[in-house]
Amino acid sequence: MGKSQQRKGAAGERELAAILGQYGYSIDRGGSYSMGEVPDLTGLPGIHIEVKRVEKLNVMEAMEQSIRDSQRMQDGIPALFHRRNRKPWLVTMRLEDWVTLYKAIQGETKAGQSRDNTLSIHSQNYLK
């Protein structure tokens, strides 16, 4: 990866961290120079954040990287956050992971736990 690509990736990580910070999440950068030793961003427990800030993205390759890294790091559901110039941020997930999150949100009880224990998240912490 060239230095300009690394700079753009680091800028994308900082940009996304700032946006998530505006939603109230305390996000830390792992550093784009870590070469996969730590996640790109941390601060959403249960979600492995992979950030791509490129004009041409091979979504399947990037998602496979996110899946591999999330399995290796055991830090949560793989989610690919990506955007192109002058375009909004998008999030790509496997359907099964999206359904898991959706079931947890829909099945949440007053105690804050999902009825089917699919994933113990609190929707107010993840979705605003």
For each predicted feature, which ranges?
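Catalytic phosphate/metal-binding cores of nucleic-acid and nucleotide-processing enzymes, i.e., regions
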Residues: M1-K128
